[in-house]
Amino acid sequence: MQDNVSQRKWNVESSKSANNAFNPIRRIVDKGGFKPNPNKSTISLSIGDPCVFGNLNILDYANDLLIENIKSSKFNGYPPSTGYEIAREAVAKYVETPTSKLTSKDIIVASGASGAIELAIGVLLNEGDNILVPKPGFPLYECTSKTKFINVKHYNLLEKQGFNVDLEHLRSLIDDKTKAILVNNPSNPCGIVYSKQHLLDIIQVAREYCLPIIADEIYSDLTFGEHKFYPMASLTDKVPILSIGGIAKRFLVPGWRLGWVAIHDRDNIFSNGRIIEGLISLSQVILGPNSLVQSILPKLLDPQNTQVKEWCSTITKTLESHSKLTVDMLSKANGLKPVCSSGTMYQMIEIDCSKYEDIADDNEFVGKLLEEQSVFLLQGTVFSLPNFFRIVFCAPIDKLTEAYERIIEFCETHKKK
């Protein structure tokens, strides 16, 4: 026996699922590559976390609710895997529309919107199936799919048409292995909000091919000016929709990890396919999301709570002013063309590399900018949009102004002579 043991060799390898788990944003933010200029303070406008600079914070009312419930010790145990009934009821009232009424049974509470996305993809697709996702788009869709050995097909967003979906390209990608269309509105990274008519056009494609829609609507409450958000589920009574939402962006608490899947089951299509039972089963894998945060949802999401509504309106106006500053300042930079944002907390900036002596692409632009000016951005290649970069404009005005002045100086330094 001892001889047999001595002849064996250790061979412990990472699983195929783990090897497929590649999130380019986290890889860049967590590990970096380029080093900032040690003589300048680093200004990071790279990650969609509104809490980084401390200028945007959840209202005290929400903190007080949470503290009160912590002290009560009523929510220290395991919640139901799909969420507390009171939390699900609150979400149902919050996301339902006059044409799409919901009850607590139509809500699955998840660990953040990313957890909700994982549930939605996991319940609709099997290994070898394919899902259609936007390009440019949020890399997590592909990362989540690949860990489940689900193939990803990217449908184009048309830059010259305000990043609307290329409907003909979308149609061309559909085959017998296509099981869902994922639509992100308002959009990360583009910062655009789709019109009602364009959403109806997308829904028509889904109806033609009998494909359910996963609607990532996490930024639904962050729209600017006259740009109105339309929940996709409010625009159809034929196409079944899994709508993704959460409190991370509206309430500035991404670390609280609270999201949801809202099930809009048209003609019992999901029920007949046991989709609801499947979501419940998948939710049981993590034994339910944060119990304490769930406990405050009835008051936090109450549509009649004017205190919360006024605070949310103030935050949105603040972000809108930051977006305007971004466009106003960076429009003056040599070789840069900002894309006007109609919502979210993101701005895409187009780079004309022909204007520079020694910058070939967005990767080089972002890398050299960090090394010389200590301003950290994400290159568009991360989102499948080369020769752009994304700015997160949540920082205080003084920090944004300083960062943009450095970017303008950088563009002048590298200007083609």
From Swiss-Prot:
Protein family membership: Belongs to the class-I pyridoxal-phosphate-dependent aminotransferase family.
Pfam family name, one = Aminotran_1_2
Which top EC class applies here? transferase
Q: What is this protein called?
A: Tyrosine aminotransferase
The superkingdom listed in its UniProt entry is Eukaryota
Q: Which organism is it from?
A: Dictyostelium discoideum (Social amoeba)
Q: Its Enzyme Commission number?
A: 2.6.1.5
Keywords from the named record: Aminotransferase, Phenylalanine catabolism, Pyridoxal phosphate, Transferase, Tyrosine catabolism
Show the catalytic activity: L-tyrosine + 2-oxoglutarate = 3-(4-hydroxyphenyl)pyruvate + L-glutamate
